């Protein structure tokens, strides 16, 4: 089924500068796999060397955090939106 994947601004440089893409996927894992197949440079920013989603990368399906659903096996429905949200750390030291 067709789903929309939102690509965050910091990662758009690795995705042809696209803000979003439409992909065919039945689960979050399939959507992310299709995304990294389409944009190979994204893979190292989303996954660690052991193939796991990086801990600072949060994924949402229709604003629901997949960590509280079925993680990457969360089922997708036609028209769902998958959002990738990398955590940002840093700041000034006082």
Describe the predicted segments one by one.
Residues 1-94:
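Ubiquitin-like/PB1-type beta-grasp interaction modules and other compact soluble beta-rich domains
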């Amino acid at each position: 089924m067709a789903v929309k994947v939102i690509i965050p601004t910091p990662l758009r440089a690795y995705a042809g500068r696209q803000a979003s893409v439409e992909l065919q996927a039945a689960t979050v894992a399939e959507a992310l796999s299709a995304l990294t197949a389409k944009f190979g440079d994204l893979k190292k920013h989303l996954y660690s060397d052991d193939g796991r989603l990086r801990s600072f990368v949060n994924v949402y399906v229709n604003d629901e955090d997949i960590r509280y659903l079925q993680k990457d096996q969360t089922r997708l429905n036609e028209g769902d939106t998958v959002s990738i949200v990398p955590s940002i750390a840093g700041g000034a030291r006082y």
